[in-house]
A protein has these predicted regions:
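Surface-exposed helical/coil interface segments that assemble multiprotein signaling complexes
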Residues: 4, 11, 16, 48, ...
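Recurring C-terminal helix/loop segment of individual leucine-rich repeat
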Residues: 94, 113-120, 137-144, 154, ...
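Eukaryotic beta-rich interaction modules
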Residues: 85-88, 108-111, 269, 342-347, ...
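Extended, non-catalytic interaction/assembly segments in eukaryotic proteins
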Residues: 348-350, 372, 404-407, 461, ...
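Homotypic signalosome interaction modules of apoptosis and innate immunity
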Residues: 1-69, 73, 578, 588-597
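Leucine-rich repeat
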Residues: 99, 120-123, 132, 143-148, ...
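Conserved "Asn-ladder"/turn position within leucine-rich repeats
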Residues: 110, 132-133, 157, 180-181, ...
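Conserved hydrophobic beta-strand positions in leucine-rich repeat
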Residues: 105, 127-129, 149-154, 172-177, ...
Length: 597
């Protein structure tokens, strides 16, 4: 049997947890008959309470997973009835009789705007109403007769407040209000929900937490977003503290604490040290999302006593941007990794940042004022880094300089390690995204230790006006895993390969797993690889505004596995061919859309 709810599965790939999102219900919406738009008794099986359980996403957020294979046919009679109408654009109110006998109700992704005034749901254990954006008001007595309700999901609805009857739900264990952008206040009566284990307010616009939160001693997950300003930029309903003193340390069972704040909120600056100190004394904390306006606050983290399997730290005071230069897909990439450090508007290379880097799997260096190389942070500190984003660091001239490996005693950091694995630089890195780097000239300077960057799968370079060198021969030898290369608005690049390859190697193919190349706004580009054979498995090519580029399909890239070529029609038709253009290439050519660039 298929249920209408998003299930998020976790699979383990090394250190990375990759979410597999299943839209359970797509199949059901095509197969079920109209009569199921009502309360119904399942044929051959019902939803099992144990099929809904807490799991941990890579970002640290609690989610619930509903598995079809957890449905137990023999449980039909004991579980009673349920309603499922997710994603059917259901707008009509459900009959009172249906509510009366339901055990679970799933009405997500609909256009529900009105709820019954006082439904009698004495057996209801789970109510899912997420993404009903037209739902603005919950009737005052709506929850009066739901004594067994354990899970309530009102995420991404238009509600502005919660009725008092909600805080009488003595059995409630999990309350989801994420993405409720109109919700700004949380009643002190929330402290009456003594059995509550999960409280998710991420994406709501809560002004402050009431001190009564400290009564929720069974809480294992707390997620909250604070926004200290109204839409017109003025402070509204400010209290002295976003989180009252003693609240966090009272929640001794917390395993997950995610706090998102407006960096302009001065209240956070005055309370942040106390909050981080309380959080770092929680013995059970495993997932921690936090904004540190000052680097020195990181010293409160005692890595020997904390067991953080997931963290997402943003460090450095900054103004929240209305428009970000970081594309959404890059933000999503950063979210994929379980331990992420964002360092914004930094100066120098603080030891506290280096300490966090040793535990991080993702690093975002944003608008650093003085650093000249990424390797200034220490290559040994970045052994676990799998995702790296570097942007708007105006002084950075190169990414890695192996000369930085030499310490004060003159012994190389690389040479000082006895084991081969210890000599590798960025050996775990899989994703590298570099953008708006006005002084960047090269990716790598100096010798390239064997297996350095050998796991890199995706490389993107955007708007680096002085960049002249991307790949040297040593780098080419190591990039055996590279699958995708994007270079955009780097006008000084003449070829992505900037080296002379010995004659005996010119017939060999480099970048053996490269499948996708995108070259846009490359005014100085003359050739892709200076005549070197690359990418024998290439499947996708995209060009735009590369006026000097000669035909790369003759002697540089393989066309055997090509599935698509994108470019300007005028450029394509002007390409010169020694024996005429093969017909099959015309079949896979697609004129590029300017919005693709």
């Amino acid at each position: 049997m298929v249920f209408d709810v998003e299930a998020v599965k976790m699979t383990d790939s090394g250190e990375q947890n990759k979410p597999e999102i299943e839209e359970i219900g797509n199949v059901a919406s095509h197969t079920r008959q109209p009569e199921v738009i009502s309360t119904m008794k399942p044929k051959g099986g019902v939803f099992d309470d144990e099929a809904v359980y807490k799991i941990l996403k890579p970002s640290g957020q609690m989610e619930f997973q509903i598995e079809d294979n957890d449905v137990k046919p023999e449980a039909s009679e004991q579980h009673g009835l349920f309603i499922k109408q997710g994603g059917l654009l259901f707008t009509m109110p459900i009959k009172d009789e249906d509510w009366k006998h339901a055990k679970e109700i799933y009405l997500m992704d609909n256009e529900v705007s009105v709820l019954p005034e006082n439904p009698r749901c004495l057996n209801l254990s789970a109510l899912f109403l997420p993404r009903n954006y037209k739902l603005r008001v919950i009737p005052p007595s709506f929850f009066d007769y739901m004594p067994t309700l354990q899970i309530l999901n009102l995420s991404r609805t238009g509600i502005k407040s919660l009725p008092d009857s909600l805080f009488q739900l003595v059995s409630l264990e999990r309350l989801f209000l994420n993405g409720c952008h109109r919700l700004m206040m949380l009643s002190p009566k929330v402290g009456d929900l003594e059995k509550l284990e999960v409280l998710d307010l991420e994406g709501a616009k809560i002004m402050n937490l009431p001190k009564e939160i400290k009564k929720l001693t069974n809480l294992i997950c707390l997620e909250v977003s604070f926004y200290g300003y109204t839409g017109n930029g003025r402070r509204s309903m400010q209290s002295n503290a976003v989180v009252p003193c003693g609240v966090i340390c009272s929640l001794s069972q917390l395993e997950e604490l995610n706090i998102d704040v407006n960096p302009d909120d001065e209240r956070w600056d005055t309370r942040v040290e106390d909050i981080v100190n309380e959080a770092c004394n929680l013995k059970t904390l495993e997932t921690f999302k936090f904004y540190f306006p000052r680097v020195e606050l990181l010293r409160h983290i005692q890595w020997n006593s904390l067991s953080l399997s997931h963290f997402r730290f943003t460090v450095g005071h900054h103004v929240k941007r209305i428009m970000s230069r970081v594309p959404l897909d890059v933000e999503f990439e950063l979210e994929r990794w379980e331990r992420c450090l964002k360092y914004i508007n930094g100066v120098g290379v603080p030891r506290d940042i280096k300490n966090v880097l040793q535990h991080a799997t993702a690093f975002f260096l944003d608008r650093h004022a003085t650093v000249k190389k990424l390797s200034d942070f220490g290559t040994r500190n970045m052994k676990q880094i799998k995702c790296c984003v570097v942007g708007e660091c105006n002084e950075v001239q190169m990414i890695i300089d192996t000369a930085d490996a030499y310490g004060e005693d003159g012994i190389s950091e690389i040479e000082s390690e006895s084991h081969d694995a210890e000599r590798i630089v960025l050996g775990s890195l899989e994703y590298l995204y570099i953008y708006y780097m006005k002084s960047l000239r090269s990716i790598w300077e100096g010798p390239v230790p064997q297996n350095s960057l050998n796991l890199l799968k995706s490389l993107t370079l955007r708007t680096c006006p002085q960049l002249t060198t991307i790949f040297t021969q040593e780098l080419l030898d190591n990039l055996c895993s590279l699958e995708e290369l994007k270079v955009e608005d780097c006008p000084s690049i003449k070829s992505i390969v900037s080296c002379k390859i010995p004659a005996e190697h010119r017939t060999s193919y480099f970048l053996p797993n490269l499948k996708k190349i995108s070259l846009h706004y490359m005014l100085g580009l003359v050739s892709i690889s200076s005549g070197l054979h690359i990418a024998p498995k290439l499947e996708w090519l995209s060009f735009y505004n590369c006026p000097s580029l000669s035909n790369p399909l003759i002697n540089e890239v393989s066309s055997h596995d090509l599935k698509k070529i994108k470019g300007e029609r005028s450029w394509w038709e002007a390409l010169e061919w020694s024996n005429g253009r093969p017909d099959y290439l015309d079949e896979i050519f697609v004129p590029i859309d300017i919005w693709d660039c």
